[in-house]
Amino acid sequence: MQDALTHGMLREYLPILVLLAMAIGLGLILIAAAAIIAYRNPDPEKVSAYECGFNAFDDARMKFDVRFYLVSILFIIFDLEVAFLFPWAVAFGDMSMTAFWSMMVFLSVLTVGFAYEWKKGALEWA
């Protein structure tokens, strides 16, 4: 009985596997066709950097302020918080008190970290 159930469940994934194989196959065929058919005539003008029709004045690599990285890391942290919070909120009715207090500890650690960043002035640009 268990073998038949497992076999039937795996059979339901067959259309997804076929679609995945077709998508990968079509992607590889299109990439190969473009590599074979494409006209290649590189010259210095084609491979040079394009900047609004003018030659590039300077190197494109510039220094960025560290605050950009700080804001991006904070965004990732709080984005992951939301990613953890949504499934927890959906299943909230079926959870025990341990799950509730675990999430409260998680949220309080993030709140304390955010308050620390705010207090240190890491989010101010002036």
Swiss-Prot record:
GO terms for molecular function: NADH dehydrogenase (ubiquinone) activity; NADH:ubiquinone reductase (non-electrogenic) activity; quinone binding. Its EC number is 7.1.1.-. It is found in: Cell inner membrane. Its main location: membrane. It is a multi-pass membrane protein. Keywords: Cell inner membrane, Cell membrane, Membrane, NAD, Quinone, Translocase, Transmembrane, Transmembrane helix, Transport, Ubiquinone. It catalyses: a quinone + NADH + 5 H(+)(in) = a quinol + NAD(+) + 4 H(+)(out). The chain crosses the membrane at residues 16-36, 73-93, 95-115. One of its GO terms (cellular component) is NADH dehydrogenase complex. Belongs to the complex I subunit 3 family. PANTHER family: NADH-UBIQUINONE OXIDOREDUCTASE CHAIN 3 (PTHR11058:SF9). NDH-1 shuttles electrons from NADH, via FMN and iron-sulfur (Fe-S) centers, to quinones in the respiratory chain. The immediate electron acceptor for the enzyme in this species is believed to be ubiquinone. Couples the redox reaction to proton translocation (for every two electrons transferred, four hydrogen ions are translocated across the cytoplasmic membrane), and thus conserves the redox energy in a proton gradient. NDH-1 is composed of 14 different subunits. Subunits NuoA, H, J, K, L, M, N constitute the membrane sector of the complex. This is NADH-quinone oxidoreductase subunit A. It comes from Rhodobacter capsulatus (Rhodopseudomonas capsulata). The lineage of its organism: Bacteria, Pseudomonadati, Pseudomonadota, Alphaproteobacteria, Rhodobacterales. The gene is nuoA.
